[in-house]
Amino acid sequence: MTDGQGNTVYFSECVIIFTSNLGIYTRAADGGRQQNVTPDMPYPEVQNRVRSAIEEHFKLELGRPEILNRIGENIVVFDFIRPEAARKILRSQVDRIFRDLSAERRIEITISERAYSVLLEHALGNLENGGRGIGNIVGALLIDPLSRFLFDNGIFSDARLEITEIDAQAAPPCLECRRS
C-alpha cells in the first residue's frame, strides 16, 4: 500500500488487529438495535452468536462476502469482561497509579478496604463498558479526586497518604485522605 506521499508499506508480514462491537447487537424488527449477546451467556454461545451476526453483516447487509472471505477464520471473538477479570483490571490500574506517583513524585499512597470497595462496586456495576469503562471509573472516582486533593492541599512530592473514603455520589466525586 502506498500513501499519498509515496511511502510504501508491505503487509505481507504484518498482523492487523482491529476491534469492533459488530455482532454484539442486531437490528430489531422496528429498525432499532437489540442486544444479540449478554454477559450472562456462556462464552461458546457468545462466540457462535457473534460469528453468525458478523457473517450475516458482511453477506447480507453489506453484500460483500469477499471481505469476509479475505479475513477468513482470523476473527477472534472476545468474551465479556467477567467479574473476576474486572477485579484484576481494577487492581492493576490502581496499583499502576500508586506506583507511578511513588516513582515520579515520591508520594506513597495506600487505600482502605472501604474506599477500595467503592471502586470495586462501581467497576462491577456495569461490565458492558469493558476495560475502558473500568478505566473511566478509576479516572472519575480515584484519579480526578486524588489530583484535586493533592493540588488543594499543596502536596506535590514526598508524602505518605491513605485514602480512607471515596464519595462517588458527590458532584464531583471526592475522597478523604489522611497522612500516614
Residue spans of the language-model regions?
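AAA+ P-loop NTPase nucleotide-binding core of proteostasis motors
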Residues: 1-180
